[in-house]
Design a protein with these regions (language model features):
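Conserved lysine of the Walker
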Residues: 29
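ATP-dependent small-molecule kinase phosphotransfer cores
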Residues: 46-107, 141
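Hydrophobic positions on the alpha1 helix immediately C-terminal to the Walker A/P-loop
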Residues: 32
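Hydrophobic anchor at the beta1->P-loop junction of P-loop NTPases
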Residues: 21
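P-loop (Walker A) phosphate-binding loop of NTP-binding proteins
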Residues: 24
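Post-Walker A helix-loop "phosphate-sensing" segment adjacent to the P-loop in P-loop NTPases
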Residues: 38-47
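A glycine- and Lys/Arg-enriched "phosphate-lid" helix/loop adjacent to the NTP-binding pocket
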Residues: 112-154
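NTP-dependent small-molecule kinase module
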Residues: 2-14, 39, 153-203
Length: 203
């Protein structure tokens, strides 16, 4: 939970900040962020799309420069988006490994973070035979599970909101849950207080 998420003070509303969407690969983060943009009026920003637009496809970046180079690009993009006032009302989707970068993790501790939780049964049909995700090679199912187990604790620690994305829940349900949780957290009345205990959003 992010105890440092800024609260309103002196009766004034808290400054608008992006909502950062985290979770494992193939969870559907980008799809949910795009849905929130279309139906709730948020700006849509996707860290991977920013990187691809500037540097080319991610699999090629990994092949030519290695994972550390990609993580440095990723950290730079996250920091850039979070400090850009033009993205103050965005749903900002970041890659599955981004919260594992120490600099990114520290930034996210003071942001409103939503964790899209899924399981292997939900994700497996999306990644079977996928050759475009370098971190999942050569065995996508096994690698996904390994990465998820390694990263899950970090996701849970950072989350102000947890969304249950298992069983292929419709994106409309997830979006409605997310919007309700955002409204709840942004309307907290007490200055300097931590957010309420994160609630798992379920249909």
């Amino acid at each position: 939970m992010n105890a440092q998420f800024p609260a309103p003070g002196d009766g004034l509303p808290a400054p608008r900040r992006p909502v950062v969407l985290i979770g494992p690969m193939a969870a559907g983060k980008s799809f949910l962020a795009l849905h929130m943009s279309k139906f709730y009026g948020y700006d849509f920003v996707d860290a991977d799309q920013v990187i691809v637009s500037r540097h080319g496809v991610i699999s090629r970046i990994f092949a030519e420069h290695g994972e550390k180079y990609f993580r440095d690009l990723e950290a730079d993009v996250v920091a850039e988006v979070l400090r850009d006032p033009d993205h103050a009302d965005a749903i900002f989707s970041v890659g599955g490994g981004a919260p594992m970068i120490p600099a990114v993790r520290e930034l996210l501790r003071s942001e409103l973070v939503a964790y899209l939780e899924v399981d292997a049964a939900t994700v497996l049909p999306r990644i079977s035979g996928n050759r475009t995700r370098p971190m999942l090679q050569p065995d996508p199912a096994r690698r996904w599970q390994e990465l998820y187990e390694a990263r899950r604790g970090c996701y849970e620690e950072l989350a102000d909101i947890t969304l249950d994305g298992t069983r292929n829940r419709p994106v409309a349900e997830l979006g409605a849950d997310l919007e309700a949780q955002i409204a709840r957290l942004r309307s907290r009345p007490a200055a300097g207080s931590a957010p309420d205990r994160p609630q798992e959003a379920q249909a």
